[in-house]
């Protein structure tokens, strides 16, 4: 490829393979009785040319990565607002939620707890986060966190109390009492 000339046919080119026949002239009709304002005509004829043109509003259903979202695009904020304040938009949102619920196996998306706020969530069950018998350990940084699981290296179970300070300041791990 040299410059913008391809050495082969571009399979994604929008140019037609053969010229299209010229459209037949449309018969003239009487002017319609509806009157549109100039701004409405401009807005209706104006297409958002690129994803960064205009304004968009994204509606994420429950905040999880797998949840659906609906993106409404318009020429300006008033255009987007006009689109979302319609019965059709509400019907669309209801339908999207119904379809998402069907594929998720539930009746609809459950609301997210707390919205996450960028905090790391633990995927361990509650029992794995609490030491047996409610045992707690402390270091110079405060209460330590109980961790248990299966070692990826050895495949053996482990249980320990870990310091919550930044990694470069952490105290040594402590092992729970064997009972």
UniProtKB/Swiss-Prot annotation:
Compositionally biased tracts (Low complexity): 29-38, 120-132
Compositionally biased region (Pro residues): 18-28
Ranges of Gly residues composition bias in the record: 104-119
Region called Disordered, residue ranges: 1-38, 102-137
Record protein name field: Gene 49 protein
Organism taxonomic ancestry: Viruses, Duplodnaviria, Heunggongvirae, Uroviricota, Caudoviricetes
Gene assigned in the entry: 49
């Amino acid at each position: 490829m040299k410059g913008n000339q391809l050495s082969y046919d571009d399979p994604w080119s929008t140019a037609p393979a053969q010229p299209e026949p010229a459209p037949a002239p449309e018969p003239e009709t009487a002017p319609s009785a509806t009157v549109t304002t100039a701004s409405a005509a401009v807005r209706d004829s104006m297409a958002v040319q690129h994803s960064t043109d205009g304004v968009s509003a994204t509606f994420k259903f429950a905040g999880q990565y797998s949840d659906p979202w609906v993106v409404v695009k318009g020429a300006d904020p008033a255009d987007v607002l006009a689109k979302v304040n319609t019965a059709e938009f509400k019907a669309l949102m209801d339908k999207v939620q119904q379809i998402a619920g069907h594929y998720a196996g539930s009746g609809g998306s459950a609301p997210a707890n707390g919205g996450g706020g960028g905090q790391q969530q633990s995927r361990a069950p509650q029992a794995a986060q609490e030491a047996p018998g409610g045992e707690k350990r402390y270091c110079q940084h405060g209460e330590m966190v109980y961790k248990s699981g299966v070692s990826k290296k050895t495949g053996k179970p482990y249980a320990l109390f870990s310091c919550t300070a930044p990694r470069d300041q952490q105290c040594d791990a402590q092992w729970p009492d064997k009972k």
